[in-house]
Amino acid sequence: RLRVEWDTRPSLRQARRVDGTTASAAHDFTARADLSGLPRNQDIFYRVRFEDADSGVLSAPVHGHLRSAPQARGDVRFVWSGDTVGQGFGINPDIGGMRIYSAMRERNPDFFLHSGDTIYADSPIPAALTVEDGKRWRNLTTAAKSKVAETLDEFRGNYRYNLIDEHVRRFNAEVPQIWQWDDHETTNNWSPGKQLDARYHVRDIDVLAKRARQAFLEYAPMRGVRADGNGRIYRKIAYGPLLDVFVLDMRSYRGANSDNLQPQPGPDAAFLGPEQLAWLQRELAGSRAQWKVIAADMPIGLQVPDGEDANGRPRWEAIANGDPGAPRGREQEIATLLRFISRARIRNTVWLTADVHYCAAHYYHPDRAAFQEFEPFWEFVGGPLNAGSFGPNALDATFGPSVMFQKAPPAPNTSPLAGYQFFGEVEIDGRSGVLTVTLRDLDGVAQFRQPILPHAAG
């Protein structure tokens, strides 16, 4: 059984004990404990051990540290990114592993938001790759990462692989985390009815998605199965009076990827789905936090293609459909949401995302848009964390985005050796309420910085 002892002092002399769940093969020996009721705005030091169910013998301890959420106004800093171990780029011992996790840890964040693609279940890790300029990329390898994930244990093995990395383990021990998922937790661009390629012996995407979801929920640092019985991933994280984070699930409720030009809303044009969309509207309207960060696993206005359909029409993976006119397809849900935010006078919303494997800052304005019933807002893109770099993607003008900054590689699928790996940092000043977003590279060097003034009524 998991045993957690925590204290506000590093000595742990007056530690409080919380017993968690039992680690067993049924959940790949993952376990969790609910540390509710922590004192606010405190450094929390903890010790984790496992107690043998029969003998009572305790394992060697593992220590960690976190800062609890604030109760009063105060400075907040967090980091976000996505896309871990993609395109065959795994843990490279020649460069010391996934160093970007140490760069994020050294920013001393209050928490980390993983915007999805926490693993690449469809991306095996070979022993070596030849990359740009003839350079050699070496990987640590495991059996689970030798092929695409199909069995439950192979999906679990993708998460175990990432934990081999010393930078990831130290980061996990020091930084609280919020995870969401995207496509690669299952397979590339998955949606209902997806046709799997020849690497797969399991041909049913629904079977893969069910196994992938179980593995994600076992390894994600979040509370267990919720009232819906299916481990709902979308949720709100309240972080003091200055910040609410609205974590979306843009994967579980979508219709099949298509030309995305449906003239009316419906199951085929769903992206968030009606229940999640209603939840988001309700939670945004009820939020009293100054800043409302919408954590999306995909960008709004970037065109993300997914090949062609049976009729040779472009098929789309994200929200945008390449048509700069009025909202159609999945864009209709976003139009409904943006209209609601405007009419309800909900201020100070900022969108954070990843997915496209380069960093960018986008500013959406109705004066440039085909759909104009919304207030201007910012969207920031981070990633990748340890994967091939791509981009930049073309914009879709429906919601009037403009590129204020972007940094992408000179060629697609550039390796991490080239340096095009990015994370974002958000800082909220406790006195002024100003929110500042900084995009940083794998060494933590700032590439772009944007302060945003709060709206007084927000």
Predicted features and spans:
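Metal-dependent phosphoester/phosphodiester hydrolase catalytic core
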Residues: 1-458
